[in-house]
Design a protein with these regions (language model features):
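Soluble catalytic domains of enzymes that build or remodel membrane lipids, polysaccharides, and related
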Residues: 1-168
Length: 168
């Protein structure tokens, strides 16, 4: 699914797995989309997948819109109780109060905890990178592997996480 926008916030989601009822949503700003979809895994199980790229806070502006979007998604996930994965450039660092509140609101796990920082931005400055790109998951998953991949031409490095869904 693709939703191109000229403002830099267009989104695309490509999957080898079946996407179920994918939708582009505008939770807090008509110019900032997010994606929600079901994904049918090879096992036949279905999970919820959220793709987010909230607007970064600008100098002399607060981050209220970004914060609201993250907390709304977190609360939605917690309310469903279903296996869920959230991924994207959250324009925030892992140790910020906003990111911690997002994880609390959704009862989400950050797979980088205990594994490293996985710094992804800016790709062109290896010594000055920090983590802006995320994969969060609910308690239904365990982490098999997580790593940052080499530069691809983006200003962010790719982040890959291999998660296993607990089938019990």
């Amino acid at each position: 699914m693709t939703y191109p926008l000229s403002n830099g916030y267009g989104m695309s989601l490509f999957s080898r797995l079946e996407l179920l009822q994918p939708i582009v949503r505008f939770l807090v700003d008509d110019a900032i989309p997010s994606i929600k979809t079901g994904v049918r895994l090879r096992s036949g199980a279905v999970i919820d997948l959220y793709g987010l790229h909230p607007q970064p806070p600008a100098p002399l502006q607060d981050s209220t819109e970004r914060d609201v979007e993250l907390v709304l998604v977190g609360m939605e996930i917690k309310g469903t109780g279903r296996p869920s994965v959230v991924l994207g450039d959250l324009n925030d660092v892992a140790w910020s109060p906003t990111t911690e509140e997002f994880a609390r609101a959704g009862d989400l796990r950050d797979p980088r905890r205990g594994r490293g920082f996985f710094n992804t931005y800016p790709a062109r400055l290896p010594g000055l990178r920090y983590p802006l790109d995320y994969v969060f998951h609910t308690k239904h998953f365990s982490v098999r592997n997580m790593r940052v991949l080499p530069k691809t031409g983006s200003d962010h490095l790719p982040l890959i996480a291999v998660l296993d869904l607990d089938q019990t």
